[in-house]
């Protein structure tokens, strides 16, 4: 099965999205999610043109890994932090097909 990547855009006010991401890192919740079976990437970014948004790139080996993550103890903690910081989200979901023809354009 192909890798699944979910981009989550957390939007807040007065620095709340960044404070959320910092608490996720400092509390160890982000590391616990990274340690879950099937997690391939869990990384926060701040768009240069929008300091009130934080982008989470969250990649998983397959849908079963995402389903297991959704019932993990970390999801309850994560949901509580989202509420604490009053965040709103936009989500994009991608399934990688590893298109071979693109590799000639990629410098690794």
Set out the residue ranges of the language-model regions.
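Short, flexible helix/strand-to-coil boundary loops that buttress conserved ligand/catalytic motifs
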Residues: 24, 69-70, 79-82
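Short, well-ordered beta-strand segments in beta-rich or mixed alpha/beta enzyme
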Residues: 4-11, 41-71
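N-terminal/domain-start segments enriched in small and hydrophobic, helix-friendly residues
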Residues: 3, 9, 13, 25-26, ...
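Glycine-rich beta-strand-turn "strand-cap" elements at beta-sheet edges
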Residues: 44-52, 77-108
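Short N-terminal helix-initiation segments at or just after the protein's N-terminus
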Residues: 1-5, 35-38, 56, 88-92
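Alpha-helical elements of the RecA-like P-loop NTPase motor core of helicases
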Residues: 18, 64-67, 76
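Short amphipathic alpha-helical segments
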Residues: 16-40, 74
